[in-house]
Amino acid sequence: MARAIEQIERDIVALEETVQAIATELHSAYTIYLTALGQAVRQQLILASYHLCTQGYPKGFLSLPFSQRQQLQQDIRKLGQNAAAQLLAHIKTEEKDESQEPEDRSIRTEVRIFNSLSAPAALASNPMDLAQWQQNLEQAIASTLKMAARETNRLLQQAGILPSKLPPPVLEVALEASEASGEAVAGSPPNLLNLVIETENHQESGESSVTHIIAIKLRLSEIEFADATVRAGRNQIRNLEVKARSLLREYLKKQQEREVAEAEAAWRASWFDE
């Protein structure tokens, strides 16, 4: 029985070594993927803003003085750059120092929230740790895209392009609610949503008004579909995920075998014939 337990322990150690190798590969794959994703996010954010300003709300954009148009474009580029920096920071936080943090305060906050993301991948000793690390990282990616779109919509609203009568919180809630059912604007690039928002009219009790709005909504699936490099990076991650899931099943099986063997040994050790 002792030999059986020792063999199971050796099997578990071998699995943990394999997990560490997969974790290293996954960390490297995410570094490549997030670098490409950051570039794609910058491009898609600018493209979505361009179509929103020129096709969705051309009058609002034309009403801006030339200097304000330039400033708006610069601010949009900066938001894209900050989002790209944050995406890579999720996987490389151990290489960043305080002076390299993005300037945007909300981005600095999110970088700190996910400041421990990189460590578990390198130190993962079992498939559960690796799966948790990846789940946290995917949540961080989704949060970054959401924040970039939110800040861009807010910028466009402050510039008078998006309807100003909708408070930013109302717009954000509408975007959240329409995430599953919202439709992309026909004939436009991805990452735009066509929204119809009903608001109460306080001047005339009992009546409400309907506001049509086009807003930016960055979708990871659409960004990956539009960029071959990002899509290839995601495919590599999926291949490693398959290996990690297989290791997880085997690891849990070995853990159960060890528990059974230890319980059997404990029973025999405490049993005595009367």
Label the predicted regions:
Residues 23-26, 30, 34-37, 41-44, ...:
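Coiled-coil heptad-register positions
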Residues 7, 14, 18-21, 136, ...:
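Charged, amphipathic alpha-helical oligomerization/scaffolding segments
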Residues 189-274:
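Alpha-helical oligomerization segments
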Residues 3, 10, 42, 69, ...:
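Arginine residue identity/basic-tract feature
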Residues 32, 36, 40-200:
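Eukaryotic long, low-complexity intrinsically disordered regulatory regions enriched in serine/proline
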Residues 2, 9, 24, 120, ...:
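A near-ubiquitous, low-amplitude feature marking generic local secondary-structure context
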Residues 1-35:
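N-terminal alpha-helical "arm" segments
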